[in-house]
Amino acid sequence: MINSIRIGTRNSPLALIQTNLVIQQIKQFFPDINCAIVPIITSGDLIQNKPLYDIGGKALFLKEIEQALLDKKIDLAVHSLKDVPGRIPEELVISAVLEREDPRDVFVCLNYKSIKELPQHSVIGSSAVRRKAFIQKIRPDLKVTIFRGNVDSRIKKLMTGEVDATILAYAGLKRLGAFNPEYCHLIEYSHMLPCVGQGVIAVEIRQNDNSMLEICNQINHLPTCELIKPERAFLEYLDANCRTPIGTYSQYLDADNIQTDFMLGNPDCSKITFHTEITNIKTSKEGGIKAAKMMLNQLKK
């Protein structure tokens, strides 16, 4: 058995917290393994003044980390699953996920509790086309402006009046200890579907690395692993980029069946379609693909 692991991750406060959560899981099963964090600055971290869809999408948060994996400079990588494209290099595999945190989005605003309450022509900071699509559906009068940066910097921009409100993932706020109920308000799934895989911490390794696979098999949270399959299959089939508004939310109906709500829009957010699919866990991937095909056809009509 190996005695040390090099774990690659982004150098942001949230990424480091999430990596330590993975290390805690590893230590539960392999207390004698030494885990060394290797912080990696990614292209997505360096370019903050442009929306992701103009500079290569969320894959920019993975590119340098995955290259370090391929070059064997690290042994495994930790990601927010919502940042992982539907298709990754064939030499790599998402081999484990931790238990999913509440995947809902949060409306962050000092003076109002919901998007509907905002005064006319207020400014919401968000660079996600998914969130923009929902905002435009609820309040077409609002202005959505580019809003990049880590959670702390976005909240600081809000506090200084750069925008009237923003929308962030609850999971990140909770892990950072930054969820403040005075100005953080959960958005229900019926009002805004989360991003694919939102709330899930993922572990990526090389396909043929049996030592890492053994570790990942132990820390993998199987119920979450099954839950995200239809969401990931939907994303992979669409081969979508950051210009395509996509939302998904999966939940167990019982021990054997999963319900997934899907949202898909065209790039300019002028048309959005919704669909709900119920599948057995054994066929949940097929359910995601079926939904993608059906919704693509609906958008073309």
Curated annotation (Swiss-Prot):
Residues bearing PTM S-(dipyrrolylmethanemethyl)cysteine:
C242
The coenzyme or cofactor needed here is: dipyrromethane
Q: Name one GO cellular component term.
A: cytoplasm
Q: Which GO terms describe its molecular function?
A: hydroxymethylbilane synthase activity
Chain's role = Tetrapolymerization of the monopyrrole PBG into the hydroxymethylbilane pre-uroporphyrinogen in several discrete steps.
Q: Which NCBIfam families match?
A: hemC (TIGR00212)
Q: Show the HAMAP family listed in the entry.
A: Porphobil_deam
Q: What is this protein called?
A: Porphobilinogen deaminase
Q: What are the top taxonomic ranks of the organism?
A: Bacteria, Pseudomonadati, Pseudomonadota, Alphaproteobacteria, Rickettsiales
Gene assigned in the entry: hemC
